[in-house]
Amino acid sequence: WSKAQIQGSSIDKEVSFVYRGNGEGAIGGLVGWNVQGTITGCYSLMTITAFTAVNAGGLVGGNEGPVTASFAAGEIVAKASGNIGGLVKNGGTLTGCYSTSVLSGTASVTICGISTGSVTANECYFMSDGVSNPGGNLPTSTKVSDAAALIDKIASMNQAIAGSGYKYVENTGTDSARVPLLIQPDE
């Protein structure tokens, strides 16, 4: 549970989480349940593997607060039933966020590119092979075809997060196909 203000936090490449719980609650790449907290300038590259029923999000599991200038580029594998969203499992307000999370599960898993539940989003996008539904009552235009298409959104995403203290820059490193945009302090 988080009611905190989380800024500039990250979970990097070599972290893996294996879930064998009872299907209650929610798990996320950074926060399991965000209860009226704020998450800004954060990212997760975590791999989550769930062997039992799960509700999971690439960055946040259950979300009731604002998430701004943040992204998820990990992987969620659901081997039982449940709901998985590339960015959040459900809820809250998302501004200037993206997900390139690899999402997979059994036939009894609901998989959505951004969120499986109701969510409010502004300038949020996802890129995931085999997943076409953004979820959360969001338009299908939130799906981008590749890293170049996401990079084309950088100006509008930065405009949406202006004043947050963070901005996106293009990633020119070797992992740019998976993480096309990096978040950094806006100084």
Would you name each region that the model predicts?
Residues 1-187:
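Predominantly extracellular beta-rich ligand-binding scaffolds that present long acidic/polar faces
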